[in-house]
From Swiss-Prot:
Stored PROSITE patterns: GATASE_COBBQ
Family the entry assigns: Belongs to the CobB/CobQ family. CobQ subfamily.
GO biological process, one term: cobalamin biosynthetic process
Gene encoding the protein: cobQ
Annotated source species: Listeria monocytogenes serotype 4b (strain CLIP80459)
Name of the protein in its database record: Cobyric acid synthase
Pathway: Cofactor biosynthesis; adenosylcobalamin biosynthesis
Cleavable signal peptide: none
Amino acid sequence: MVKQIMIQGTASDAGKSVLVAGLCRLFKNKGKRVVPFKSQNMSLNSFITATGDEMGRAQVFQAEAAGVFPDVRMNPVLLKPTNDRQSQVIFMGAILDNMDAVTYHDFKQTLIPKIQAVYQSLADENDIIVLEGAGSPAEINLNDRDIVNMGMAKMVDAPVVLVADIDKGGVFASIYGTIMLLNEEERARIKGVIINKFRGDVALLQPGIDMIEELTNVPVIGVIPYANLQLEEEDSVSLSGKNYVPDSNALLDIAIICLPRISNFTDFHILEIQPDISVRYIRNIADFGNPDLVIIPGSKNTLEDMAFLEESGLKNAIQNYAKNAGKVIGICGGYQMLGKKMLDPNQVESKQLEIAGLGLLDTETIFLDQKRTTQITGVTHSGEAVEGYEIHMGETKRGESTSPFCEIKAVNGNEETHQDGAISVNKNIIGTYIHGIFDNDVFLGNLFDELLTGKNKSVYPHEIINLKEHKEQEYDKLAALLEANIQMDQLEKIMKGEKICVSTQKPAIKE
C-alpha cells in the first residue's frame, strides 16, 4: 500500500515546492519509487511533457528530484491566469475553458472523482506519494469547496505537515493562526510542523517552539536552515525579490523585462547560475540602464503586456536600445511583441482586436483558439542543435526582411520539419517560440561569446554550467539538508499513520 505525506504551508512561498522536491530526492536515494502530486496548481510557469501535455513547472522539477519523467498525472489541474479575474483551466494537460473565479469555484467539484482516479493510478504504481498544497489551507472563504489543501488531504486520507517561513517574520503567529482557523477535523490532520529558512542559533528559537507546541499540541519536527540553493523558483511572489541593479563586476549585464503577466520565467534560471553574468528584472525605464542583452519573456496576455510596455515607457526604451545596435531576444509572447502588430479577431487573449508591436521584426501575429503544446528539437540558423518546448496560441508570419531562427526537425519525438522564429537583417533582433532555448549549452556559450566580442572583449572564459548536471547536484544537497534537519523517524511514523507526541527532543541546525 502506498505511503503518503502532504506538505501544506502557512502562505505562498513558504517553501512547499522545494520541500516536496527534497523529500522526493531523499526517498529516491533510499531506493523508493516516489512521485510528487499537486491536484491543482495556479501558475504561469508550465512545461510540455513528451506526449504534448501541459503541466506546472514545480511538479516537473519535483519529478526530476524523484528521478522520474514528468507525468501530467502529477498535476492534473493547472490554472493559468489570463487577467486578474479569469484563468485558463487545463485538465490533464489540455485546455477545458477560460473561467472566472466564481464559475470555477462552482465547477471544480465536478473534478473531484477525476482527481481521485488520477491519484489512485499513481498510488498503484509507487511506494510513496509526496503531495503539495497551495497557498494556505486557512483560506476560510474557499475551504467549503477546496480540492488542493485539506480537501485533497481528505480525499485520500493523507497526513499533513505544515511548513512555515521564518525568514519573513511572524512565524509563530502564522503557525498558530493557520491551525486555529481550521475546523477540528482539519486540525487533526496536521501531524507536524516544519520551520523553514531559519538563520541563527536554534537555541534562541527553542522557547518559541516549546510554546507553539503547547498551544497547538502539534510537534515541530524540523527546523530547516536558510540555504542558498540554486533551484528553480515557480511562485511569482519570488520575482519581487529579484535583482534590478546591474553588477558592475560582471562580464555581461542581461536585462529581462518583468512583464505584469510574465510566464515561464524559469527560462532564465540557467542564466542566473552562470558565473560572471548579471541577470536583472526591470519593471520601469529608470532601471533600464545599458544592458548587453534585453530579453522579453513569455506572457499569458501578450496584448495587455504590450500595452504595459507602451504605458511604462519601456517600449520606447527597447526601440531606442535596438536602434543603437542593442541585442534583443523575445521568447514566445516576447517574440510576438517584437513584430509589427498582433491581431486577436476572436478575442482569445483580450478584448483588443489589434495592437501595434515594437516593430523590431518584420512579423505579424494572429491569435488562434487552438493552443500549440509540443516538445521540439531543431537546429538554429547558426548551426547549433537545440531542444525545448512550445506553448502558444498565436501564429506568426515572417516578412521578406527576416529569416527563420531555427529549423525544427522533430515534434514530440516524431520527425517533422518546419521553421521557427525570426531574425532581423542585422542579426541583433531574435524571436522564437522555443522555451528552454538558453538551456542548450552550445547555443548559450556562443551567445555569450558574441555579446563579449561585441564589447571588444575576449570570449566567455568559463565553461557553461550544464543545467541538468547542476540540478542533480542541487537536489542531492537539498535532500541532505532535509535529512539532517528533519526528525525523519517522526516523519516516517506520520506516514505510517502512527501517532507522535510533542517531544522534548531539541532540534539542532545542521548546515
